[in-house]
Swiss-Prot record:
Domains (record comment): The conserved cysteine present in the cysteine-switch motif binds the catalytic zinc ion, thus inhibiting the enzyme. The dissociation of the cysteine from the zinc ion upon the activation-peptide release activates the enzyme.
EC id: 3.4.24.-
Motif Cysteine switch: where in chain: 170-177
Effect annotated for changing H342L: Loss of enzymatic activity
Organism this protein belongs to: Homo sapiens
Any one GO MF annotation of this record: metalloendopeptidase activity
Cofactor(s) needed by this chain: Zn(2+)
Major localisation: membrane
Name listed for the protein in its UniProt record: Disintegrin and metalloproteinase domain-containing protein 30
Length: 790
């Protein structure tokens, strides 16, 4: 075993190792490795130095005092800019292979570069994102790696002295002939007169780092450790490339936490590189764009420690791979920088190439920096194009937080610049809400006020989606939820990842409303061939995997009853296959890998979750049992009055309330926010309850009305004095006698009245007779008149 120099007393070392071993037994990630890639180590306590004129709360350079081998060294550091985005995207996978995306919290301004005072050509790259100092630095020709000692309560750190490493020719697998062949397409485009313009403006490279499953296991499945390793690796590469005025920006990170996405068990790293560039182009580029991608592998190979292929800004196959074997960070970062140098046009150094007067440069066999030859190659390449390096990444760190249109820390809002804030009715330029305002942005914010409870802030997109509602107390809309995978939908389909998967619907979406799904004969005739029109997997530019007979129905979509050729995206090919025996015309589309970088979607591949038989679905181009969807929402769970969402909670129908749709309510789930009363849609349950309550209220009101009527009636009657019973009886008899007398009197009066009336009638009759007699007496007698004439 190699001897180790220890700069501690034996007692102190014993006290240091005991808690370290104890914590290790408890599962802590204690970084304490005296062997491996290090010559020696010692423990020190960095002392932060303060200077006059420092402004509290403003990011400024920092300095630490380190004592190594009995000598004091001052480490000056200043913050790195543009190293990370505001929200770093981290992709990982569940044990079932489902893709996850996270945006972990990373402290602001925790990455630094610097140098050691009074040390020749010293450089340092330090990260404080995990607490303590972690990184690399050199004092003269010696390189060190510093790590915080987690077992220490007094800010102790372990400083490792790295080996004097000469990588040799085994580092990079690229030969000079291969480099010349890869550079050939760019040579004729370069123009020497473009060098000054290219040098004047800095370049920016957006990088994606990937880590295989072995590396994830090496750090005890600690995803946070992998993230901070990636940040430090990128920081070291960025420090190297600042010499040529190019910045490295870590755009995203992918960790294969479940299994490796490509085969990595080849004896040579070059074969892994071939698989990786296919994965990058066919899978990674579809998820997010970048200028370059690099894969780290926890494995040794026979041919080299690192490989690369292609150039930045190329839509063709490009990428790099390297090994990451232990806790030594500087060596893998240097190998990555070497391969990234090839990606930006740098060749291997010749014997006459120098960096700071030395021969061990990055593009040779050392780690001092880039040589003068690398400078020339780099500027020659960027003069030939490489326009993607001109894009400035989004600023990840800004000193002035208020005004960047991002609500953060204690800000209530952020309307941007002063001019923009003058037009904002809700937010002030000091990132405070206007007086009387509740909010400024959000799906549940309108005219500076919260939307009322029950307002639909996100409509359902289809029958497999679910709506979300404002709660009246926040400007944010609840997270998007949808029906659980496996929920039945129309045309005998199933919901899967927020969409109804059905061959019938997929045929109509491509070939029009008259199209129908084809029978199994079409799938067998096409998908068992294994070309761009019929396959179960695209494995390369011109390589296709034919389907097995049992899985042919999960390959490329086949339709019938196609009347017209549809208008599809450019470069999409339609193919028809005639089956003479069945007299069928089968229709489908073709697809190949070169269409992926152009952003052309593959419309003709059967969607995962599509039914392929009774109790079976297509999943990853195989016809498998539908249990893979993990659908476990029985109707009884929601009392047959709702469905389960993707969080396995009941989303109730209108008229019933969550969580289990047992009580009367307005529907929704505990995840959707509270729905409101629908206009013109009152469910029967509410009608029944309303009628019962109305009748009950009427009954109560009737009883109350009768009661008060009787009370009021009794109250309005005149009061009567009480008297003795005998007196009351006498008065009652007198009253009775009086009543009889009155009745007799009344009867007598009636008889008198009748007699009087009779007399009057008799008198009137006599008068009429007398009047008649008088009239008759006055008439002349005719007989006497006749006698006088004679």
């Amino acid at each position: 075993m190699r001897s180790v120099q220890i700069f501690l007393s034996q007692c102190r070392l014993l006290l240091l190792l005991v808690p370290t071993m104890l914590l290790k037994s408890l599962g802590e990630d204690v970084i304490f490795h005296p062997e491996g890639e290090f010559d020696s180590y010692e423990v020190t306590i960095p002392e932060k130095l303060s200077f006059r004129g420092e402004v509290q709360g403003v990011v400024s350079p920092v300095s630490y005092l380190l004592q190594l081998k009995g000598k004091k060294h001052v480490l000056h550091l200043w913050p790195k800019r543009l190293l990370l985005p505001r929200h770093l995207r981290v992709f990982s996978f569940t044990e079932h292979g489902e893709l996850l995306e996270d945006h972990p919290y990373i402290p602001k301004d925790c990455n630094y570069m610097g140098s050691v005072k009074e040390s020749l050509d010293s450089k340092a790259t330090i990260s404080t994102c995990m607490g303590g100092l972690r990184g690399v630095f050199n004092i003269d020709a010696k390189h060190y790696q510093i790590e915080p000692l987690k077992a220490s309560p007094s800010f102790e750190h372990v400083v490792y002295l790295l080996k004097k490493e000469q990588f040799g020719n085994q580092v990079c697998g690229l030969s000079d002939d291969e480099i010349e062949w890869q550079m050939a397409p760019y040579e004729n485009k370069a123009r020497l007169r473009d060098f000054p313009g290219s040098y004047k403006h800095p370049k920016y490279l957006e990088l994606i780092l990937l880590f295989d499953q072995s590396r994830y296991r090496f750090v005890n499945n600690n995803l946070s450790q992998v993230i901070h390793d990636a940040i430090l690796l990128t920081g070291i590469m960025d420090t190297y490339f600042q010499d040529v005025r190019m910045r490295i920006h870590l755009k995203a990170l992918e960790v294969w936490t479940d299994f490796n996405k490509i085969r990595v068990g080849y004896p040579e790293l070059a074969e892994v590189l071939g698989r990786f560039v296919i994965y990058k182009k066919s899978v990674l580029n579809a998820r997010l764009s970048s200028d370059w991608a690099h894969l780290y592998l926890q494995r040794k190979y026979n041919d080299a420690l690192a490989w690369s292929f292609g150039k930045v800004c190329s839509l063709e196959y490009a990428g790099s791979v390297s090994t990451l074997l232990d806790t030594n960070i500087l060596a893998p970062a240097t190998w990555s920088a070497h391969e990234l140098g090839h990606a930006v046009g740098m060749s291997h150094d010749e014997q006459y190439c120098q960096c700071r007067g030395r021969l061990n440069c990055i593009m040779g066999s050392g780690r001092t920096g880039f040589s003068n030859c690398s400078y020339i190659s780099f500027f020659k390449h960027i003069s030939s194009g490489a326009t993607c390096l001109n894009n400035i990444p989004g600023l990840g760190y800004v000193l002035k937080r208020c005004g960047n249109k991002i609500v953060e820390d204690n800000e209530e809002c952020d309307c941007g610049s002063t001019e923009e804030c003058q037009k904002d009715r809700c937010c002030q330029s000091n990132c405070k809400l206007q007086p009387g305002a509740n909010c400024s942005i959000g799906l549940c914010c309108h005219d500076c006020r919260f939307r009322p409870s029950g307002y639909v802030c996100r409509q359902e997109g289809n029958e497999c989606d679910l709506a979300e509602y404002c709660d009246g107390n926040s400007s944010s809309c609840p997270n998007d939820v949808y029906k659980q995978d496996g929920t039945p939908c129309k045309y005998e389909g199933r919901c899967f990842r927020k969409g109804c998967r059905s061959r019938y619907m997929q045929c109509q979406s491509i070939f029009g409303p008259d199209a129908m799904e084809a029978p199994s004969e079409c799938y067998d005739a096409v998908n068992l061939i294994g070309d761009q029109f019929g396959n179960c997997e695209i494995t390369g530019i011109r390589n296709f995997k034919k389907c097995e007979s049992a899985n042919s129905i999960c390959g490329r979509l086949q339709c019938i009853n196609v009347e017209t050729i549809p208008d599809l995206p450019e470069h999409t090919t339609i193919i028809s296959t005639h089956l003479q025996a069945e007299n069928l015309m089968c229709w489908g589309t073709g697809y190949h890998l070169s269409m992926k970088p152009m952003g052309i979607p593959d419309l003709g591949m059967i969607n995962d979750g599509t039914s392929c038989g009774e109790g079976r679905v297509c999943f990853k181009k195989n016809c498998v049992n539908s249990s893979v969807l993990q659908f476990d929402c029985l109707p009884e769970k929601c009392n047959t009055r709702g469905v389960c969402n993707n969080r396995k909670n009941c989303h109730c129908m209108y008229g019933w309330a969550p969580p289990f749709c047992e009580e009367v309510g307005y529907g929704g789930s505990i995840d959707s926010g509270p729905p409101g009363l629908l206009r013109g849609a009152i469910p029967s349950s509410i009608w029944v309850v309303s009628i019962i309550m109305f009748r009950l209220i009427l009954l109560i009101l009737s009883v109350v009305f009768v009661f008060f009527r009787q009370v009021i009636g009794n109250h309005l009657k005149p009061k009567q004095e009480k008297m003795p019973l005998s007196k009351a009886k006498t008065e009652q008899e007198e009253s009775k006698t009086k009543t009889v007398q009155e009745e007799s009197k009344t009867k007598t009066g009636q008889e008198e009245s009748e007699a009087k009336t009779g007399q009057e009638e008799s008198k009137a009759k006599t008068g009429q007779e007398e009047s008649k007699a008088n009239i008759e007496s006055k008439r002349p007698k005719a007989k006497s008149v006749k006698k006088q004439k004679k």
